[in-house]
């Protein structure tokens, strides 16, 4: 049952980003990103990452609601264009859905989906004492490794988000 839930969440995840890529109006693009982010958090939760799923949900979606609330307020149209009002946009949306459907059919026919990355040998990132007894969460270990070993990744990500907000505000202010 859990496999089917993850499969359905994955399909909704891809459909939301097909909707983002063929967005006719900024309102629907933001809606597609919010749905995709929420479903992505659901996929993380289904694999046991409760802490990471909650953090992504709070930080990513909280930040996106602020940014897209501001940008859609700046770029609001009286009659926003929807997916079915333009044949090219509707065709791109349907084409994306057909391609996704064909990929799903191919994956179901072949019976296997190969893992692209192997994460063997990465257990030496965090050294902890095993002398005591207790519960040790792997998620907190991963977050600690991200902030200790991946500090440049965090800095670049923060700078990219800041520049993205500045670019979005400049684009919406100019129109």
From Swiss-Prot:
It is a multi-pass membrane protein. Keywords: Electron transport, Membrane, Mitochondrion, Mitochondrion inner membrane, NAD, Respiratory chain, Translocase, Transmembrane, Transmembrane helix, Transport, Ubiquinone. Its EC number is 7.1.1.2. Its main location: mitochondrion. Signal peptide: none annotated. Core subunit of the mitochondrial membrane respiratory chain NADH dehydrogenase (Complex I) which catalyzes electron transfer from NADH through the respiratory chain, using ubiquinone as an electron acceptor. Essential for the catalytic activity and assembly of complex I. This is NADH-ubiquinone oxidoreductase chain 6. It comes from Balaenoptera physalus (Fin whale).
């Amino acid at each position: 049952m859990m496999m089917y839930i993850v499969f359905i969440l994955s399909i909704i995840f891809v459909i939301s980003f097909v909707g983002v890529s063929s967005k006719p109006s900024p309102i629907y693009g933001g809606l597609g990103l919010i749905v995709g982010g929420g479903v992505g958090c659901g996929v993380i939760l289904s694999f046991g990452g409760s802490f990471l799923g909650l953090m992504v949900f709070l930080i990513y979606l909280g930040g996106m609601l602020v940014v897209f609330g501001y940008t859609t307020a700046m770029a609001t149209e009286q009659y926003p264009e929807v997916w079915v009002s333009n044949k090219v946009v509707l065709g791109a949306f349907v084409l994306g859905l057909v391609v996704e459907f064909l990929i799903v059919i191919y994956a179901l026919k072949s019976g296997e989906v190969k893992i692209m990355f192997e994460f063997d040998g990465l257990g030496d990132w965090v050294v902890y004492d095993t002398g005591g007894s207790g519960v040790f969460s792997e998620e907190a270990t991963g977050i600690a490794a991200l902030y200790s070993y991946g500090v440049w990744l965090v800095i670049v990500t923060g700078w990219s988000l800041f520049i993205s907000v500045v670019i979005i505000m400049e684009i919406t202010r100019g129109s």
